[in-house]
Amino acid sequence: MASQTHGIQQLLAAEKRAAEKVSEARKRKAKRLKQAKEEAQDEVEKYRQERERQFKEFEAKHMGTREGVAAKIDAETRIKIDEMNKMVQTQKEAVIKDVLNLVYDIKPELHINYRVV
């Protein structure tokens, strides 16, 4: 009987060591996965930053700076407003004359649906 309990003790100890080894292996695997995930996130972040930098270079090269674009838009807007003001000055009298003629020249007529009863 003593040999059986000794054998059982050895089996239990071996099972305990195996469980510890499995536990350690799981911990190492989890640690490796966490490290791989962090490395992947770092790599993605570096790639994103590089693409952002390339885009900003492209944008600056092809579109100019925001201040430059804003100044260009302001200049174009001023030119168009000046052109519209000139058109108003040249057409103002003719438009007023046409509007007044339409207001003063009233030609009363019966509506087409009106029926004398």
From Swiss-Prot:
Belongs to the V-ATPase G subunit family. It comes from the Eukaryota. GO terms for cellular component: apical plasma membrane; presynapse; vacuolar proton-transporting V-type ATPase, V1 domain. GO terms for biological process: synaptic vesicle lumen acidification. The keyword Transport applies. Residues 35-44 have a biased composition (Basic and acidic residues). Pfam families: V-ATPase_G. One of its GO terms (molecular function) is proton-transporting ATPase activity, rotational mechanism. PANTHER family: V-TYPE PROTON ATPASE SUBUNIT G, VACUOLAR ATP SYNTHASE SUBUNIT G. This is V-type proton ATPase subunit G. It is found in: Apical cell membrane.
